Curated annotation (Swiss-Prot):
Assembly: Homodimer. Part of the ribosomal stalk of the 50S ribosomal subunit. Forms a multimeric L10(L12)X complex, where L10 forms an elongated spine to which 2 to 4 L12 dimers bind in a sequential fashion. Binds GTP-bound translation factors.
CDD domains the record matches: Ribosomal_L7_L12 (cd00387)
Annotated PANTHER family: 39S RIBOSOMAL PROTEIN L12, LARGE RIBOSOMAL SUBUNIT PROTEIN BL12M
GO molecular function, one term: mRNA binding
Single GO BP term: translation
Entry GO CC: cytosolic large ribosomal subunit
Encoding gene per record: rplL
Record has Ligase as a keyword: no
Record protein name field: Large ribosomal subunit protein bL12
Role noted for this protein: Forms part of the ribosomal stalk which helps the ribosome interact with GTP-bound translation factors. Is thus essential for accurate translation.
Source organism per UniProt: Clostridioides difficile (strain 630)
């Protein structure tokens, strides 16, 4: 299997499947996917802080149109009805991780149009 084939397989996975993959890789290789914590800040004259390029879209509140929000979550994530309903029922919940700024803004607009409250982190 080539790297391109692996990336393509990952690209086609649903959010829940990606989460399971990360957990399995952490257990198999004894590593953690969480970012390391920096103890000290950058020294004066050090490199400037990098601009954030990946964003997480978090569904914070469903609002009054639960059905519309479930439809939007299904459209955005490709999840089945049951999985999308679980995401909506368990808000606040991350809908998309590692999205570009443009993609995160588009997802936020779709969910807000469906009546949800959304946060981009």
């Amino acid at each position: 299997m080539t790297i391109e084939q692996i990336l393509e397989a990952i690209e086609n996975m649903k959010v829940l499947e990606l989460n399971e993959l990360v957990k399995a890789a952490e257990e198999k290789f004894g590593v953690s996917a969480s970012a390391p914590v920096m103890v000290a800040g950058a020294a004066a004259g050090g490199p400037a802080a990098e601009e954030k390029t990946e964003f997480d879209v978090v569904l914070t509140d469903v609002g009054s149109s639960k059905v519309g929000v479930i439809k939007a979550v299904r459209e955005i994530t490709g999840l089945g009805l049951k999985e999308a309903k679980e995401v909506v029922d368990n808000a606040p919940k991350t809908v998309k991780e590692g999205a570009s700024k443009e993609e995160a803004d588009q997802i936020k607009e779709k969910l807000e149009a469906a009546g949800a409250k959304v946060e981009v982190k």
